[in-house]
Curated annotation (Swiss-Prot):
GO terms for molecular function: serine-type endopeptidase inhibitor activity. Its main location: secreted. InterPro entries: Kunitz_BPTI, Kunitz_BPTI_sf, Prtase_inh_Kunz-CS, TFPI/VKTCI-like. It is found in: Secreted. It comes from Homo sapiens (Human). It comes from the Eukaryota. One of its GO terms (cellular component) is extracellular region. The gene is SPINT3. This is Kunitz-type protease inhibitor 3. Disulfide bonds join C36-C86, C45-C69, C61-C82. Residues 36-86 form the BPTI/Kunitz inhibitor domain.
Amino acid sequence: MQLQASLSFLLILTLCLELRSELARDTIKDLLPNVCAFPMEKGPCQTYMTRWFFNFETGECELFAYGGCGGNSNNFLRKEKCEKFCKFT
């Protein structure tokens, strides 16, 4: 009987933690500036710098050539950073 109660408690605890994690993720998405929805913008300068941006249409981080100045905040040095910041799946 105690084993069944302990297992039930662990199951409920696991479900609560998962729900809390999901709610926190949704809250973060709502609080973050909508940087990930900005269009890719290379900027006015002519330097060629490989960067990553989140393509809101495809839901993927994609490579682009950044000019070195200007642009917007949808501009990441590494694909991993882009995915960490913009992909909530």
